[in-house]
Design a protein with these regions (language model features):
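GHKL (Bergerat-fold) ATPase N-terminal catalytic module, capturing the glycine-rich phosphate-binding loop
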Residues: 1-185, 193
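GHKL/Bergerat-fold ATPase module in large chromosome/replication-associated machines
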Residues: 114, 132-154, 174-629
Length: 629
């Protein structure tokens, strides 16, 4: 006779917490029930191994699913160890009491995987079921029992005859509501997709009768055929020996698992054993996803525990600077919280994340050294992320990432590393020269590049918006400071050249002051310079914000009209300087127009906008007319 009992452990309150608070997604219940079935099957298989029970054949150990649309039931059956009355009472009557955890502690065996450790997964069934019925017979026992509960009302246990060894859990699904369509769990395709998503690598066959439409023999008509189908693949690719896996298998797995049409650029398959053991299968895509640089993109690796899917985007497992890496991690050493949906941010997770970061860095370094062509393709697609890594960490990641960076060399006309630049520095060169701009062509034509190139020094081209911000955070490489050729003094002149330049500036002091006065607050200074060779004029920023930074900051949605300190430099060896001297001496009232024209010309060369394009155009026209009078 059935006896009504109440749950232990603050029954209603705790059960409500289990059902309504712990699990984010209701569909998790099927993963939990299948995991419990796998645990029960593990226990029987372990018993057969340790006690030499020949009648138990692993090939017969399956997990069977069935659904009944008419009666709105979903059933999960295992052929595992089963439970007697006391075990049903202990494991199902007491919330958060885990038989699997107890079994694992007692056996201390590495030969068996026990997934459930907290004793609450079973109760997730009540998220979708108004009533749950568990029929079970323990291995070696003649009597079976049925446990029935409608959640907070407690439970009943009664004897049931003629039960097979194992357990059958029958869920009587809730009625549909406006928020939830519980009929989804009576749809064979939805059930198949949930098994594929969460339990594909449970190492026992998960079977279900499925209906498919097939063409009749010798006829154009179709008929429904019911077949018992295995829904899971059981053996994870990452658990196999790397030597036995073909490139095609990795490629197909990646494309199927991560919804990409292209093969990955790089596969990283690693297994680590020790205090924290894990398998990782990582992929570097051939191309960035469409939303890679948008706020919609989520980084993270898929997380498995003993082959059971836990989380799709475990963001803590991958650092921001390697956010382009896709893949998964499978570990039995991670501490999972009570629902298995969210990880506790603990030491094991940190250890795995650190090792994965080092592995990715090592593989990229290897690629750079041994397969330069592929690495340059990688850097073209994802190098920006490495640069952001240094910038966003305020230079803390400099030592980790600086040797992975590539820059275009104006001298070599190809991408080079900072190490390669330093190794090829000329005798007497103490700084790493760089210039910024939108394209290689624009940078190569900058007047400021000319003086450096004239001394046979290489110039690195910075063409990404983040470059100068990153360089500011790095400060130097191998004790060699970075030097912007368009900012401050280049210190390239000899003592004799410096003295000569000082004399020219002194001799033309009143002219230069007049030009500065004409430009008022547009410039902080006007001077002659040896920086220029063939060009008449250029703008140089002071030691604050550079021109490229000005452009980037002002292009931002919250740009605040940032201005770099402008220094107008004039080439004393250019005919334009003689023309200005002549105007100043013979027609001083025109000096304002010449100053304005020179300044606007320098702005245009630098890629900066001029305040009044119409006035600029009119002044050029006036000058052309005047010259032809």
């Amino acid at each position: 006779m059935a006896e009504k009992k109440q749950f232990k452990a603050e029954s209603k309150r705790l059960l409500d917490l289990m059902i309504n608070s712990i699990y984010t997604h209701k569909e998790i219940f099927l993963r939990e029930l299948i995991s419990n079935a796998s645990d029960a099957t593990d226990k029987l298989y372990y018993k057969a191994l340790t006690e030499n029970i020949s009648e138990i054949n692993k090939s017969d150990l399956t997990i069977d699913l069935a659904f009944d649309k008419e009666n709105r039931t979903l059933t999960v059956t295992d052929h595992g160890i089963g439970m007697n009355k006391e075990e049903l009472e202990e494991h199902l009557g007491t919330i958060a009491n885990s038989g699997s955890f107890k079994f694992k502690n007692e056996t201390e065996s590495d030969d068996i995987d026990i997934i459930g450790q907290f004793g609450v997964g079973f109760y997730s069934a009540f998220m979708v079921a108004k009533k749950v019925e568990v029929s079970s017979r323990a291995y070696g026992s003649d009597q079976g029992y049925t446990w029935v509960s409608e959640a907070s009302d407690g439970y009943e246990i009664f004897e049931t005859d003629n039960l097979p060894t194992g357990a059958t859990i029958k869920l009587y699904l809730k009625d549909n509501t406006e928020e939830e369509n519980y009929d989804d769990y009576l749809d064979q395709y939805h059930i198949e997709s949930l098994v594929k998503k969460y339990s594909d690598y449970v190492h026992y066959p998960i079977k279900m009768d499925v209906t498919t439409s097939k063409k009749k023999e010798d006829s154009d008509e179709y008929e429904d055929v019911v077949e018992n189908k295995t829904l899971n693949s059981m053996v994870p690719l990452w658990k196999r020996n790397k030597k036995d896996i073909k490139d095609e298998e990795y490629n197909e797995f990646y494309k199927d698992k991560f919804n990409d049409f292209s093969d990955p650029m790089k596969v990283i398959h690693t297994s680590v054993e020790g205090n924290v053991s894990y398998d990782a299968l990582l992929f570097i895509p051939s191309q960035p996803p469409m939303n890679f640089y948008s706020n919609d993109y989520e980084k993270g690796l898929q997380l498995y525990s003993r082959g059971v899917f836990i989380m799709d985007k475990a963001s803590d497992l991958i650092p921001e600077h390697f956010r382009f890496v896709k893949g998964l991690v499978d570990s039995q050493d991670l501490s999972l919280n009570i629902s298995r949906e969210m990880l506790q941010h603990d030491r094991q997770l940190k250890v795995i994340a650190d090792r994965i970061e080092k592995k990715i860095q090592s593989e990229l370094t290897n690629m750079l050294k041994k397969d330069r062509e592929t690495y340059e393709k990688f850097f073209k697609n994802f190098g920006l992320q490495l640069k952001f890594g240094i910038y966003q960490s305020y230079g803390m990641l400099k030592d980790k990432l600086q040797d992975l960076l590539l820059f275009y060399s104006g001298k070599e006309e190809k991408m080079i590393t900072l190490k390669e630049y330093v190794e090829n520095m000329k005798e007497g060169q103490t700084e790493i020269y760089f210039a910024s701009g939108e394209t290689k062509e624009k940078i190569s034509h900058l007047p400021q590049v000319e003086a450096v190139r004239d001394r046979d020094f290489d110039v690195l081209y910075m063409m990404d918006n983040v470059d100068e911000f990153m360089i500011q955070m790095m400060r130097d490489y191998d004790s060699k400071a970075f030097k912007n050729v368009a900012q401050g003094d280049l210190n390239l002149d000899s003592e004799e050249e410096k003295k000569e330049l000082e004399k020219i500036n002194e001799d033309n002091k009143s002219l230069l002051e007049s030009l500065k006065e004409a430009l008022k607050d547009k410039v902080v200074d006007v001077k002659v310079s040896n920086r220029l060779k063939s060009h008449p004029v250029c703008l140089v920023s002071d030691q604050g914000v550079s021109f490229e930074m000005e452009k980037v900051l002002n292009a931002m949605p919250d740009g605040q009209d940032v201005k770099a300190g402008r220094i107008l430099e004039i080439n004393p060896n250019h005919d334009i300087f003689k023309a200005i001297q002549n105007v100043y001496q013979n027609n001083a009232d025109k000096i304002n127009d010449y100053a304005s024209l020179l300044f606007d010309q320098a702005l245009l060369i630098e890629g900066l906008s001029i305040e009044d394009p119409v006035a600029f155009s009119n002044k050029i026209c006036e000058l052309m007319i005047e010259l032809n009078k």
